Amino acid sequence: MALLHSANPADQIIVALDGMAPDQALAFSVQVEGLRWVKVGLELFVQAGPEVVAQLREQDLRVFLDLKFHDIPATMAGACRRAAALGAELITVHACAGSEALNAAQSAAMEGAQSSGQPSPTLLAVTVLTSWEEQRLQRELAISQGIAPRVSALAQLSATAGIGGCVCSPWEAAALRAQHPEPFALITPGIRLKGAAVGDQARVMGPAEAMTAGATQLVIGRPITRANDPSAAFNACCRELRT
């Protein structure tokens, strides 16, 4: 299903439930008034199991399942079929898995959703993780290609394979949006409010800047989840997007 840019700031923000125990994640999701989207990552999924997706959906939340599948085509297809059957509406796969695996994953996800009566999901290709810096990418992985051209190439590979969007740093959003107009989705982590700590993200940007650059939705974790008042922090992000 095509994921179109929403004018509602609450729909533009996906809150990452990283670092939370299952009961904390479920309680937090109820606590933040106006919350529409949450991200379930590896840590929470491994601890809570697939049922956490159903539990969050019972709270009328939409789920971004960020497990970054990267395997042979048959395995990726099976995983994406199961993920879509759970009701996850955004599902991540690694673009580096290649076109055959991406094609298989896309087809299987649609089959899984349809057979289970769930919403049609949007698969998102992971290009270059926002924790990478160019020099370290070259030093540790022997990749001489710069981050920007590598992201561009992987996004093009994904779009050609029928994937509905990609995860990218906000710093790559403008260039990718110029190459891939909507409904191709651009989901950007690495979002920080002014004055907030950067943490382990190397390529960050403010919410309004990222949306202006072409992002469809923003993934925001610690600036909201670790705030003294998460609801106030969420509302502050929404206000920034309205300006």
Curated annotation (Swiss-Prot):
Top-rank taxon: Bacteria
Pathways per UniProt = Pyrimidine metabolism; UMP biosynthesis via de novo pathway; UMP from orotate: step 2/2
Q: Which GO terms describe its cellular component?
A: cytosol
UniProt cross-references to InterPro entries, sorted A to Z: Aldolase_TIM, OMPdecase, OMPdecase_AS, OMPdecase_bac, OMPdeCOase_dom, RibuloseP-bd_barrel
Protein's GO biological process: 'de novo' pyrimidine nucleobase biosynthetic process; 'de novo' UMP biosynthetic process
Q: Tell me the enzyme class.
A: lyase
Single GO MF descriptor: orotidine-5'-phosphate decarboxylase activity
Binding site residues for substrate:
18, 39, 66-75, 130, 192, 201, 221-222
Q: What is its EC number?
A: 4.1.1.23
UniProt keywords, alphabetically: Decarboxylase, Lyase, Pyrimidine biosynthesis
Q: Which family does it belong to?
A: Belongs to the OMP decarboxylase family. Type 1 subfamily.
Function statement: Catalyzes the decarboxylation of orotidine 5'-monophosphate (OMP) to uridine 5'-monophosphate (UMP).
* Record text on subunit structure and interactions: Homodimer.
- In Swiss-Prot or TrEMBL terms, this protein is called Orotidine 5'-phosphate decarboxylase
Q: Which organism is it from?
A: Synechococcus sp. (strain CC9902)
